[in-house]
Amino acid sequence: MKVAASSLRKGFVVDMDGKLYVVLNVENIHPGKGTPVTQLNMRRISDGVKVSERYRTTETVERAFVDQRDHTFLYQDGEGYHFMNPESFDQLVASPEVIGDLGAYLAEGMVVQLSTHNDLPIALELPRTVTLEIVETEPSVKGQTASSSYKPAILSNGVRTMVPPYIAAGTRVIILTEDGSYQERAKD
């Protein structure tokens, strides 16, 4: 469906020359003289190349229809990451390029938001937090509880993060999936 370039927002998916792009940033520029323009910074979904385009605010852009649904992560193999729609039991395979760094946080049975275009996965949204176990970290030093310094730790998924000094190996912690940072100790 055609929409005015000025109405696009961050996260929208547009179809340009048969390729899909996700909008990263939109800036409406109104110069003192001349026509107002909309500056779009986008990323091509197929290969991750970043593109910058300028449109007059009256020009139209083809907005792609994207279907967002909950899917359950099943497993990963040589083909890619396998997901199942819990309502229809249809299975989809997402390529490693679509999943990117988020694959480290996927666990069997995890429910995620999968965005598809013509039944092809194009984007993944994880839950805000995940609970993981610390497998390796430096031992805590007595008397260091009052300092605000953090120490490096390796999580059960292989990701490195910084944790407070009182956290020991074997402790289950809650991690923010957007940046991999420590949130709090798990209460289980």
Swiss-Prot record:
GO cellular-component terms in the record?
A: cytoplasm
PROSITE patterns membership: EFP
Query: What is the name listed in the Swiss-Prot or TrEMBL entry for this protein?
Result: Elongation factor P
Compartments annotated for it: namely:
Cytoplasm
Member of which family? Belongs to the elongation factor P family.
Recorded source organism is Caulobacter sp. (strain K31)
Pathway the protein takes part in: Protein biosynthesis; polypeptide chain elongation
Gene3D superfamilies linked to this entry? 2.30.30.30, Nucleic acid-binding proteins (2.40.50.140)
Please indicate which superkingdom the organism of origin belongs to: Bacteria
